[in-house]
Amino acid sequence: MDQKQIEEIVRSVMASMGQDVPQPVAPSMQEGAKPQCAAPTVTESCALDLGSAEAKAWIGVENPHRADVLTELRRSTAARVCTGRAGPRPRTQALLRFLADHSRSKDTVLKEVPEEWVKAQGLLEVRSEISDKNLYLTRPDMGRRLSPEAIDALKSQCVMNPDVQVVVSDGLSTDAITANYEEILPPLLAGLKQAGLNVGTPFFVRYGRVKIEDQIGEILGAKVVILLVGERPGLGQSESLSCYAVYSPRVASTVEADRTCISNIHQGGTPPVEAAAVIVDLAKRMLEQKASGINMTR
C-alpha cells in the first residue's frame, strides 16, 4: 500500500465520519522528525534539556570544513550524527543525551498505566495471568493468557460475537498507550461503526502480550480482533504503538503469520488518526476475504 492509497483511505473514512481530513504535522513539530538545525555550534550547556528539539539538533563538530553540509545532514535524519568527538571519545553532551534517551526507554517499560487513567477513559480493565511488572518481563508466556477473573469479566460484561473486537494493552510501552489513545481509539471506533460493522466492547488488558488476542477472540466469538499495544521502545522513542489484527483467531491454531501488523504509530511515524483510518479499511478487507496475515490477497 503506497502513500497515495493511504491518503485516499484516510479521506474516505474521515469523510464518512463527517470529519475534516487531518493535515500533516509539520516536520519540526513531530517527535522523531527531521530536526531543524541552526548554524553548527560546539557550545555545550549543562542547562540544556536533553530531550528537547534543541538538544537533538545540536551539532558538536569543531571547526567544520563545510558547516552547511553538516547542517543539511543534521536536518535530513533523526540519527545521532554530527555530534563530534573529544579525541577517541564522544563529547559530553552527546553522551549525556544518549544516556537520557536510554533512561527514558527503560522508564516506559517499567512504568504502569495508572488505574485512574483507565477509569477516566471508561474502559473495562482485565489482566493476564501476570501479577506484576517483573513477572511480565520474565514470563512472557503468562502474558499470553487471561486470568480466570478476566475470562469471567469478558463473558459477563462484553458484547458477544462482534464483527470487530478492539483491545488496548500496555505491552512494553506505557507512554505509547497514554500518548496516542485519544487520537486513535475514538476515530477507530467511529470509523468501524460508520462502516456498518458490529463493534464489541473495547477494554484494556494489563500486562498483555500479542497472542492474548487469540484467547480473547475465541472467548467472545469475534470475527476480527484488533489489538493496540505498546511497542518495545527504541532509543529516545518511547511512544510508538502497534496494531495487530487477526481474523477468527484460535489459541491452538493461530500463528504469527496469521496476523497483520501496523507498527510505528506515533506523531513522528504514522499519525494515530491516519492509522485509525487504515485499520478500519483493513478490518473491512479482512471480513470480505475472511483472512488475515499472509492469507490475505492484496
Curated annotation (Swiss-Prot):
Annotated NCBIfam families: PRK05465.1
Cofactor annotation: adenosylcob(III)alamin
Protein name (database record): Ethanolamine ammonia-lyase small subunit
Subcellular location: Bacterial microcompartment
GO biological process: amino acid metabolic process; ethanolamine catabolic process
PANTHER family: ETHANOLAMINE AMMONIA-LYASE LIGHT CHAIN (PTHR39330), ETHANOLAMINE AMMONIA-LYASE SMALL SUBUNIT (PTHR39330:SF1)
Pfam families tied to this protein: EutC
Taxonomic superkingdom: Bacteria
Family: Belongs to the EutC family.
Organism of this sequence: Salmonella heidelberg (strain SL476)
Catalytic activity: ethanolamine = acetaldehyde + NH4(+)
Pathway assigned to this chain's UniProt record: Amine and polyamine degradation; ethanolamine degradation
GO cellular component: ethanolamine ammonia-lyase complex; ethanolamine degradation polyhedral organelle
EC number: 4.3.1.7
Function noted in UniProt: Catalyzes the deamination of various vicinal amino-alcohols to oxo compounds. Allows this organism to utilize ethanolamine as the sole source of nitrogen and carbon in the presence of external vitamin B12.
Gene name of the encoded protein: eutC
Subunit structure, as described in the record: The basic unit is a heterodimer which dimerizes to form tetramers. The heterotetramers trimerize; 6 large subunits form a core ring with 6 small subunits projecting outwards.
